[in-house]
Regions:
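Short catalytic/ligand-binding loop motif for oxyanion handling, primarily in non-cytosolic enzymes
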Residues: 19, 47-51, 132-133, 177-180, ...
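Leloir-type glycosyltransferase catalytic cores
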Residues: 281-301
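A short beta-strand-loop structural module common to alpha/beta enzyme folds
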Residues: 36-47
């Protein structure tokens, strides 16, 4: 199938780097199965000043959908769809293909059926926060998300300290989890007890483990590192941190999509990953199935 006749998989991106990686990974896998070209729709970033397209430095291989924000007709169509119980996905101007809106947080088997129609363009919208959406294409995803060519010289200098079997990346998510009441109500920051139990488990298997603490709150990371017998580390950007954490031999992650990817991008099949059982705040956990966010070999605490 030549490029001119190939179908298009269009991914509607939103959120920060971690969210965008999940969305792009689902799109990459679907496009690969369909022999399709991958495109990304950036319209949702145009009216949100806090977030922007974060994947440009990576070799994702996606083209950007042309055009501006959805017009009046697209907005009315989305509102009508939402009123009828749909997800209210705004079609970008010029889109005439199918639309697949993720129906819920846990894995949706219907996603696999999208590749059955090899001739039809499809737009996907959602979070897609499970490795099951790109099962069998993990190597492709890791190759397209390889940040080694985009990180700073500072990160490369830090990388030398992470070499060896003893390195442990510990990630603490703060930011909006503690400063934004709405984000706190959905996610909730983890307690120190989780990290202490995780580090006890790590040190039981690796007594000489070297602990490196990463966070979007460097001062807090330094304080924790001092208490935990480790050291804080920070790259010059979020992409630096993602890459540096992926180099470590063991991973203690936060309840964060960004944190998730820092562990998943470590390609070693025997890498130890400890993840929190509390993926969301209690009220959100009560109504959300989260089992599919964890790869089978990850340890939950």
């Amino acid at each position: 199938m030549d490029a001119s006749s190939a179908p298009t998989v269009l991914v509607q991106l939103h959120g920060g780097l971690g969210n965008q990686l999940f969305q792009a990974a689902a799109g990459l896998a679907l496009a690969d199965r369909m022999g399709a070209r991958l495109m990304v729709d950036l319209a949702r970033f145009r009216d949100r000043s806090l977030r922007g397209y974060a994947l440009a430095p990576l070799p994702v291989g996606a083209q950007i959908w042309p055009g501006g924000s959805p017009g009046m007709i697209e907005r009315l169509r989305a509102r009508f769809d939402k009123a009828r119980g749909g997800k209210g996905v705004r079609r970008p101007p010029g889109w005439r293909g199918r639309v697949h809106a993720e129906p819920h947080y846990h894995y949706d088997p219907a996603f696999e059926a999208l590749s059955g129609d090899l001739s039809g363009d499809v737009l996907i919208a959602g979070f897609f926060q499970s490795a099951r959406y790109f099962a069998g294409r993990e190597s492709l995803v890791r190759a397209r998300f390889d940040a080694s060519g985009a990180v700073s010289d500072h990160a490369r200098a830090c990388a030398a300290r992470l070499a060896g079997e003893a390195s442990v990346a510990v990630h603490i998510r703060r930011g909006d989890y503690v400063n934004d009441p709405r984000a706190a109500a959905v996610h909730g920051a983890l307690t120190e007890d989780y990290y202490l139990r995780a580090l006890d488990h790590v040190r039981a298997q690796a007594p000489h483990a070297r602990v490196f603490v990463f966070s979007d709150d460097p001062a807090f990371a330094a304080s924790c590192a001092a208490r935990w017998g480790g050291e804080s580390m920070a790259g010059a950007s979020a992409l630096d941190d993602l890459w540096l954490m992926s180099l470590c031999r063991r991973h203690v992650i936060a309840n964060s999509s960004f944190s998730w990817w820092s562990a998943f991008l470590d390609p070693r099949p025997d890498a130890m990953v400890i993840a929190p059982v509390q993926w969301f705040a209690p009220a959100m956990m009560a109504k959300t199935r989260v089992e599919d966010v964890y790869p089978p070999h990850w340890l939950r605490m």
